[in-house]
Amino acid sequence: KFHAYFPTANSYPAIVADMLSGAIACIGFTWIASPACTELEVAMLDWLGKMLELPAEFLACSGGKGGGVIQGTASEATLVALLGAKAKKMKEVRETHPDWDDHTIISKLVGYSSAQAHSSVERAGLLGGVKLRSVPADEQNRLRGEALEKAIEQDLADGLIPFYAVVTLGTTNSCAFDRLDECGPVANKHNVWVHVDAAYAGSAFICPEYRHLMKGIETADSFNFNPHKWMLVNFDCSAMWLKDPSWVVNAFNVDPLYLKHDMQGSAPDYRHWQIPIGRRFRALKLWFVLRLYGVENLQAHIRRHCTYAQQFAELCVQDSRFELAAEVNMGLVCFRLKGSNERNEALLKRINGRGKIHLVPAKIRDVYFLRMAVCSRFTRPEDMEYSWQEVSAAADEEEQQQK
């Protein structure tokens, strides 16, 4: 009955694996520090990538440059991708403008994201010391290729250097899907790094019926989603794939004598793929969950949540006082009382004040609405009915008070 934010997953296999990881107590910053920690992570990211049907260029088993890494959060992945893109673009600009210093180049760099992108994208820009431009979304809250092209062309005309674009698949406000199939080719044409943020919705791509939403993934340079949101792996476990990790590795490469070893170059040292140096044995819980649940059970879990969201949406539209504020995607329903924002603010305060269910709001184009996310693996159809009854009862109380 906790329906705020997006899910934070857990399961008994993941909990046991986390306990075992704590007992093993390895700090897997290099291969030599814990070969199993590194090797299992390489294997698990390949397993997971195959479940999503990611292009082979992202997978270590392809024999190419690509590979995956487990970050702590999608916020970290967004920043890591930005810093890799920044390093790549600065190298390119130095070759064409050898007289420009780093400060001059950095001052001209500009990145892009939808106005509906997560706040962590803006934060990555602040931490990376670069400008990020918010591009208006369309009426369905999606970033479109035409809008991105227009923004890039304008910045090029102003003497700026486009270097990075974040395409969101499953926005936080309304679970909208940017048009990767349009934005990717535009970014590729201008040699702009494409990072795909699918933090919540990415788990659904293990189901074939949802993979059309990631059409154009072959145009991306990096892709990220959080198994710890919707795939029964407890926090923290954020999967990230890179087509060419060398840009990130070279950007982060600090190699003191005490971390050197004879196997460098033959296996990844994941300390070069992330912001921290030390890292937990996070691949263990991913392995436990994949082995004990299997793909079909994980798919069934995703599909149940999507069905429950549709059930709640149907209950909502059957009440003439309410309306849907956005298309129902995945396990999220955006709804509101017809009328003013103030009415909906009062309704949310009353719902949460009753203490039976918990929701959070969002606002798009100055329209305030409530978000109902299916969060628990224990949720059943009767819970959706109960939650709707709570919403309806709170609306009744609010109407009585207004009389």
UniProtKB/Swiss-Prot annotation:
- Assigned keywords, A-Z: Catecholamine biosynthesis, Decarboxylase, Lyase, Pyridoxal phosphate
Q: Which Pfam families match?
A: Pyridoxal_deC (PF00282)
Q: Which GO terms describe its cellular component?
A: cytoplasm
Q: What Gene3D superfamilies is this protein classified in? A: Aspartate Aminotransferase, domain 1, Type I PLP-dependent aspartate aminotransferase-like (Major domain)
> What Gene Ontology terms for biological process does this UniProt record contain?
amino acid metabolic process; carboxylic acid metabolic process; catecholamine biosynthetic process; serotonin biosynthetic process
- Residues annotated as carrying N6-(pyridoxal phosphate)lysine in the record are 229
* TM annotation in the entry: none
Q: Which CDD domains match?
A: DOPA_deC_like
Q: Where is this region: Disordered?
A: 250-276
Q: What is its EC number?
A: 4.1.1.28
PANTHER family (UniProt xref): AROMATIC-L-AMINO-ACID DECARBOXYLASE, GROUP II PYRIDOXAL-5-PHOSPHATE DECARBOXYLASE
Q: What does this protein do?
A: Catalyzes the formation of serotonin more efficiently than dopamine. Displays no activity to tyrosine. Variation in the synthesis of bioamines may be a factor contributing to natural variation in life span.
Q: Which family does it belong to?
A: Belongs to the group II decarboxylase family.
Write the protein's name.
Aromatic-L-amino-acid decarboxylase
